[in-house]
Regions:
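C-terminal structured domains
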Residues: 102-104, 228-367
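Short glycine-rich, basic-tinged beta-strand/loop micro-motifs
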Residues: 26-36, 72-81, 144-156, 269-286, ...
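Short amphipathic alpha-helical segments
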Residues: 43-47, 83-87, 163-166, 288-296, ...
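Acidic, serine/threonine- and glycine-rich low-complexity intrinsically disordered segments
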Residues: 184-258
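An N-terminal, globular interaction/scaffold subdomain
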Residues: 43-104
C-alpha cells in the first residue's frame, strides 16, 4: 500500500535551510541503526511520528516515504517535493548532504516501484490496483513528450480532483517522480478504455522504446536548462527589460511574470530564498555579453558551492540590466558570499541583490 506522509505547514521559520539539513542529518545518523531495525521488524508505527515531526522542522509541505534500497538491499528514505520544482531543488540539496550510513540509500524524488503489481492505493473507500489502469499514449514530437489518455473502471465513482490524485500517484509509481515530470505531457481522463490503450505496467517499457527510437534525452528537472526570449521588453516592473535568458527553474520565471512582480514567496518557511543579482548591462562588452556574465556566474557558483550555501539557477540580459539568478540556502552567510564575489568582480554602482518574493523586496542589498 502507498505510504506517503505529509505534515501541516508551520508558520515560523528561523534556521536557514542549510542549518536545518545539518540538524536533520545529525539526528538521523544517530538513529539510523535503530530505524533500520524497526523497519526490519515492521514497526512502522514507532518511526512514523518521529520522522514526520523532524521532516516538518526540515521542510514543511514535503512528503516522505520508506522503501527498499537498490536491488532490494537495505532500506531507502525518500524526501519529495511532490512535483513542486521549487521544493525539488531543496530536496536534492538535502540528498547531496546525506552522510554515508550502512544499509541506507537516500532519494530526493519518488522512485519507480520495484513491485508495481503488488502496489495499491485506497481513496474514497475504493481500492485502486495499478494493473487496472489503461493508458493510450500519443507522441508529441514538438515538445518531446508522451501525451496519455487514462482510464480506470473506478474513475466514475470518484470526484474529478481525486481521479487526478490517484492517476499521478500511479504514474509516479510506474515511472518515478522525475520520470513523470520529464516524459509525460498532456494528460486526459476517458470514461472508456480506448482501443489503442496499453496497461500501466507496460508504460515503463513504452517510455524506454520511445527513448531508443526518438533519441529524446531527459534529465532531472533540477538539471534541465531552458533558454527563453521576451518579445516585448518593458519597464513596468523589475526584470521587465529582459530580452533573453536561460534558467533551470522556468516555473519561477513564469510565476514571477504572471504575478507582475507581486510573487508570493515560493520558498516560504523553508529557510531558503530565490534572489537575483541586477547590474547595468552597459558594462558588458559588445558581442561578449554572455561570456562576461558567465564569468561572474561561475565565480558566484564556485563560492556558494564551496560552502554548500547556494547555487546558480539562471541568468538573463536586458535593455538596461543584466541578471544572475541564485538559490540561497544559508541566509546572511549566503548573502555575504554573494556580496564578496560581486565586489571582487568590481561591479559598478547600481548593482543590487534583489529578492524574488514580493514580501521580501525591502531586503534588497545595494552592493
Amino acid at each position: 500500500m502507498v505510504s506517503i506522509f505529509r505534515r501541516k505547514v508551520s508558520q515560523t521559520s528561523e534556521p536557514t535551510f542549510k542549518e536545518r539539513v545539518q540538524n536533520f542529518w545529525q539526528w538521523y545518523a544517530e538513529r539510523a541503526a535503530t530505524f533500520h531495525g524497526n523497519l526490519k521488524q515492521k514497526q512502522h508505527s514507532i518511526i512514523q511520528p518521529q520522522i514526520s515531526a523532524k521532516v516538518d522542522e526540515l521542510l514543511p509541505s514535503a512528503a516522505w516515504v520508506f522503501g527498499d534500497g537498490p536491488n532490494g538491499n537495505g532500506h531507502s528514505f525518500t524526501l519529495t517535493g511532490e512535483g513542486n520544482l521549487h521544493l525539488q531543488f531543496l530536496t536534492e540539496y538535502w540528498r547531496k548532504q546525506a552522510p554515508s550510513l550502512e544499509g541506507w540509500t537516500f532519494y530526493s524524488s519518488r522512485q519507480p516501484s520495484n513491485d508495481l503489481e503488488s502496489w495499491q492505493i485506497k481513496i474514497e473507500g475504493e481500492t485502486f490496483n495499478p494493473l487496472e489502469f489503461w493508458l493510450a499514449p500519443n507522441l508529441d514530437q514538438e515538445r518531446e513528450k508522451i501525451d496519455i489518455t487514462a482510464w480506470h473502471p473506478l474513475f466514475a465513482k470518484l470526484p474529478e480532483k481525486n481521479r487526478w490524485t490517484v492517476l499521478f500517484l500511479v504514474l509516479d509509481e510506474a515511472l518515478g517522480e522525475f520520470g513523470t515530470q520529464t516524459w509525460i505531457g498532456e494528460i486526459n481522463v476517458s470514461d472508456r478504455r480506448l482501443a489503442d490503450a496499453l496497461p500501466l505496467k507496460e508504460l515503463p517499457a513504452f517510455v524506454g522504446r520511445t527513448e531508443d527510437e526518438t533519441g529524446w534525452k531527459k534529465y532531472a528537472p533540477t538539471d534541465t536548462w531552458t533558454g527563453y526570449q521576451m518579445n516585448e521588453p518593458h519597464s513596468r516592473f523589475r526584470r521587465g527589460d529582459i530580452i533573453t535568458g536561460t534558467t533551470v527553474n522556468p516555473i519561477l520565471l513564469r510565476e514571477f511574470l504572471q504575478s507582475d512582480d507581486k510573487l508570493e514567496d515560493p520558498l516560504f518557511n523553508t529557510g531558503a530564498d530565490f534572489v537575483f543579482v541586477q547590474f547595468p548591462s552597459e558594462i558588458l562588452p559588445g558581442g561578449k555579453q554572455i561570456e562576461k556574465r558567465a564569468q561572474i556566474e561561475n565565480a558566484l557558483e564556485a563560492a556558494l558551492a564551496s560552502d554548500a550555501a547556494g547555487q546558480l539557477i539562471g541568468g538573463a540580459l536586458g535593455t538596461q540590466f543584466a541578471y544572475i539568478d541564485l538559490l540561497l540556502l544559508d541566509g546572511a552567510n549566503s548573502l555575504d558570499i554573494v556580496q564578496k564575489v560581486l565586489r571582487e568582480c568590481t561591479l559598478p554602482k547600481g548593482t543590487s541583490i534583489e529578492f524574488y518574493a514580493h514580501s521580501k523586496r525591502d531586503r534588497r542589498i545595494v552592493v
